[in-house]
Amino acid sequence: MSGRRSFFASKKPSRSSNPFDSDSDDGGREQRPARASSVPPPADQRGSLFGGGDGFSASSAAARSRYRNDFRDTGGVEAQSVQELEGYAAYKAEETTQRVQGCVRIAEEMRDTASKSLVTIHQQGQQITRTHMMTLDIDQDLSRSEKLLGDLGGIFSKKWKPKKNGEIRGPMLTRDDSFIRKGSHLEQRHKLGLSDHPPQSNARQFHSEPTSALQKVEMEKAKQDDGLSDLSNILTELKGMAVDMGTEIDRQTKALGDSEKDYDELNFRIKGANTRARRLLGK
């Protein structure tokens, strides 16, 4: 009996053969390596691969390097796994989004420059109108001076009459009221230091990060659609501003031609009045 007791006492239960043991009691059991080629990486690792996560690692940098040169160093696109191609598609989608957003920024800079040009043209039109209006005041003063010069002289002298080639008409063209209002509005915003165009508010908001490459591609496509929509709206604004500025420049060119005629007429009459005054002083 003692031999049997010693036999049962010396025999220890095997942990490796008990299927009900916990995973923590596996002891020195050999672990089988996981197959990385058939299982997609976790969400945080994929997020770092796309540049959206905080854990940007050397592996993600290496992946971006492969995507950047289109797998030229690793056998080309045809030799890549489905997982690599999914990451490549997400990378290209993100790259396209960045290019679209770059085009939008360039268009916004062009719109800001066009807004400043519109304000400058508006101020130039105001200056042309004010300067031409002054010819009417000069004409009134000159007419009184010519009348006094004609009354001066001896009793038997021939009465002097000023020579005129035409009438001083002043501004004949009326400026476009819509352009004046638009230019005045932009000018006031510039003085107040306000932005000419508020940022677009119709862009879609994404509250969660994508958990797969396909979701990343779809999100980037949505961003591209928003960017292209903004770009189309800005280009439409630029086209309208270009038409307005072209019409205003043509109107100002015609106004300058009319004002030049009045300036030449005033110059001719002033020369005649000066000649009359010198003759009176020489007597």
UniProtKB/Swiss-Prot annotation:
Residues 218-280 form the t-SNARE coiled-coil homology domain. PROSITE patterns: T_SNARE. Plants overexpressing SNAP32 exhibit enhanced resistance to the fungal pathogen Magnaporthe oryzae. Plants silencing SNAP32 exhibit increased susceptibility to the fungal pathogen Magnaporthe oryzae. This is SNAP25 homologous protein SNAP32. Residues 1-64, 192-212 are annotated as: Disordered. One of its GO terms (biological process) is defense response. Disulfide bonds: none annotated. One of its GO terms (cellular component) is SNARE complex. The keyword Lipoprotein does not apply. Belongs to the SNAP-25 family. Expressed in roots, culms and leaves. It is found in: Membrane. Interacts with SYP121. t-SNARE involved in diverse vesicle trafficking and membrane fusion processes. May be involved in resistance to the rice blast fungus Magnaporthe oryzae. May contribute to host resistance to rice blast through interaction with SYP121. Its main location: membrane. Residues 198-212 have a biased composition (Polar residues). Keywords: Membrane, Plant defense, Protein transport, Transport. Induction: Induced by infection with the rice blast fungus Magnaporthe oryzae. Induced by hydrogen peroxide, osmotic stress and drought stress. GO terms for molecular function: SNAP receptor activity. It comes from the Eukaryota. SMART domains: t_SNARE. The keyword Methyltransferase does not apply.
